[in-house]
Each structure stands twice: as structure tokens, then as C-alpha cells.
UniProtKB/Swiss-Prot annotation:
CDD domains (alphabetical): S14_ClpP_2
Keyword Endoplasmic reticulum: no
Species whose genome carries this gene: Corynebacterium glutamicum (strain ATCC 13032 / DSM 20300 / JCM 1318 / BCRC 11384 / CCUG 27702 / LMG 3730 / NBRC 12168 / NCIMB 10025 / NRRL B-2784 / 534)
Gene3D superfamilies reported for this sequence: 2-enoyl-CoA Hydratase, Chain A, domain 1
Record's subunit section: Fourteen ClpP subunits assemble into 2 heptameric rings which stack back to back to give a disk-like structure with a central cavity, resembling the structure of eukaryotic proteasomes.
Cysteines joined through disulfide linkages: none
Keywords annotated in UniProt: Cytoplasm, Hydrolase, Protease, Serine protease
Cell compartment(s), UniProt: Cytoplasm
Main location: cytoplasm
Entry similarity comment: Belongs to the peptidase S14 family.
Active site: residue positions: S108, H133
Task performed by this protein: Cleaves peptides in various proteins in a process that requires ATP hydrolysis. Has a chymotrypsin-like activity. Plays a major role in the degradation of misfolded proteins.
Keyword Translocase annotated: no
Protein name per its UniProtKB record: ATP-dependent Clp protease proteolytic subunit 1
Length: 208
């Protein structure tokens, strides 16, 4: 019987496996095993579904032990600004420090989450990339007044993203605005220099 931990949708089928303990056997999967180790994995775009999953895990892990760090691994192309801010607020709300680690890429909304980790506990692997840019929105239609409302909301989101990134990188909001006017792609070392992360992790594998 499955343990009920929902895995992200993917064409790659993750294996389940059987664990034995003093309480018997149980079927589990890699995501459930990571959760037991207080690790959350964001491996999809940032949307309402993934945001709700991540927020629920953050709150549960806080309840289990409010004094132990939580680690958020990120490999995401980004996504919804409102979903991003929901995760961001929860990361700042919970008592445990949230470590962030980029594997592969942290683009757009995911880059903000990477930067929002606890100070000194944000990292990236050597060949990962980080991309920051201004928030995007779907094409709008309607009367002039509707378009004005949408334009004001886009500008509000942009200012919020700029001040959020500025807070966590040490850059000014004005510099963030200049840098995100177009896509800004950073290597691991450049993300470190920019202040999005605090360290570039080396490989665990021993070099021969």
C-alpha cells in the first residue's frame, strides 16, 4: 500500500521501494524519503499547486520540530508571481531556517526563492544557472480602464520583486530594476558574486 505522499507529475516514473523497521514494512518513494530528512524538492514550475504543496510541507516540518533547519532544493523554470510570494511569505513565516540549494536552474520566480533562503545557508551547484527578470503577465484585453488596472498591478509586482531581491542580495532596488529589465543569466559563481547565494557547493564525490 502506498504511503499517500504525492509525487510531482512526470513522464519519468519514480521507483517505489520497501523499507523495514521495528514497526514493520512500508512502501515509500524518493520524495517521501527526502521529506523524512526535512528536505523539500521543487522540481516543477512555480504555480498554485506546487506552492500549496511546498507551503504544506514547510508548515508540517515546523510543527514536527521548530528548531531544525529545513532544506529546499530547487530545479525550476519559475512561474507564477503570486504563487512565488505565497511560498516566500511561508518561508519567512515559519520558525526553522530554510536552507536553499539550486540544482540545475533557478529561473524567474525560483531565483527569488533561492535568494530568500536563510542568510549564510543559500547555495548552488557548480554548473547550475540562475535567471532573473521582471515579472511577466499574460496578454490582457478589455477597456482602457481595465488595461490601466492591469498595468498598475504589473508595476506593483515588479516593485515588490525588486525590493524583495534587494533585501536578500544587498543590491539596491534601482540596480535590480536595471538588471531585470531583460533576462539576466548568471553562472554559479556570478550568482555568488551577485548575492543570490552564499556559496558554491563542491561535489561530494571524491576526486580520483
Amino acid at each position: 500500500m502506498s504511503n499517500g505522499f504525492q509525487m510531482p507529475t512526470s513522464r519519468y516514473v519514480l521507483p517505489s521501494f520497501i523499507e523495514q523497521s521495528a514497526y514493520g514494512t512500508k512502501e515509500t518513494n524518493p520524495y517521501a524519503k527526502l521529506f523524512e530528512e526535512r528536505i523539500i524538492f521543487l522540481g516543477t514550475q512555480v504555480d498554485d499547486t506546487s506552492a500549496n504543496d511546498i507551503m504544506a510541507q514547510l508548515l508540517v516540518l515546523e510543527g514536527m520540530d521548530p528548531d531544525r533547519d529545513i532544506t529546499l532544493y530547487i530545479n525550476s523554470p519559475g512561474g507564477s508571481f503570486t504563487a512565488l510570494m505565497a511560498i516566500y511569505d511561508t518561508m519567512q513565516y515559519v520558525r526553522p531556517d530554510v536552507q536553499t540549494v539550486c540544482l540545475g536552474q533557478a529561473a524567474s520566480a525560483a531565483a527569488v526563492l533561492l535568494a530568500a533562503g536563510a542568510p549564510g545557508k543559500r547555495a548552488v551547484l557548480p554548473n547550475s544557472r540562475v535567471l532573473i527578470h521582471q515579472p511577466a503577465t499574460q496578454g490582457t484585453q478589455g477597456q482602457v480602464s481595465d488595461l490601466e488596472i492591469q498595468a498598475a498591478e504589473i508595476e506593483r509586482m515588479r516593485r515588490l520583486m525588486e525590493t524583495t531581491l534587494a533585501e536578500h542580495t544587498g543590491k539596491t532596488a534601482e540596480q535590480i530594476r536595471i538588471d531585470t529589465d531583460r533576462d539576466k543569466i548568471l553562472t554559479a559563481e556570478e550568482a555568488l558574486e551577485y548575492g543570490i547565494v552564499d556559496q558554491v557547493f563542491d561535489y561530494r564525490k571524491l576526486k580520483r
